[in-house]
Design a protein with these regions (language model features):
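PRPP-associated nucleotide enzymes
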Residues: 1-145
Length: 145
């Protein structure tokens, strides 16, 4: 989120950018069918019907996260709901479980994607193997590998 805002600032793009988080997991760590959305309160207070909102996600696969975000916004904003568009670098049409699709995308794929910033699900050994620049940090915060 911060990197996006910095890019907008450097490019001189006037924006009111915020990060929204979604989760499919309950407090017990089990996957839910419903999506939990966090961080909409600022948008709900600020949005007006004449505004335009671009929702950007790293991957549009099932579409459930974006669908829930838009549902929650429309429910809360009512007549103040702005025009909403969706952008993503990666679109997985074969995985889409909604009637939505992104307005803008760069690539269509059905492959599993792993982004350079992702660490979740990797063992310490896999992190060191694939991201050797993190070894010194890992050595300080975890037992020897």
């Amino acid at each position: 989120g911060i990197a996006v805002q910095e890019l907008f600032d450097v490019l001189g793009v006037d924006s009111d950018h915020i990060a929204i988080r979604t989760s499919y997991y309950s407090s017990m760590g089990e996957r839910n069918d419903s999506v939990q959305v966090y961080g909409l309160s600022y948008l709900i207070k600020k949005l007006e019907s004449e505004d335009s909102l671009l929702i950007v996600d790293d991957v549009f696969d099932t579409g459930k996260s974006i669908d829930q975000i838009i549902f929650d916004l429309k429910t809360a904003c009512k007549k103040n709901t702005p025009e909403i568009r969706i952008a993503t670098p990666y679109y997985k049409p074969s995985q889409n479980k909604t009637d939505r699709q992104p307005d803008y995308h760069l690539h269509e794929t059905d492959k599993w994607l792993v982004f350079p910033h992702e660490l979740e699900g990797l063992s310490a050994e896999e992190i060191v193997q694939n991201k050797p620049e993190l070894k010194d940090l890992l050595d300080k915060i975890t037992p020897k590998l």
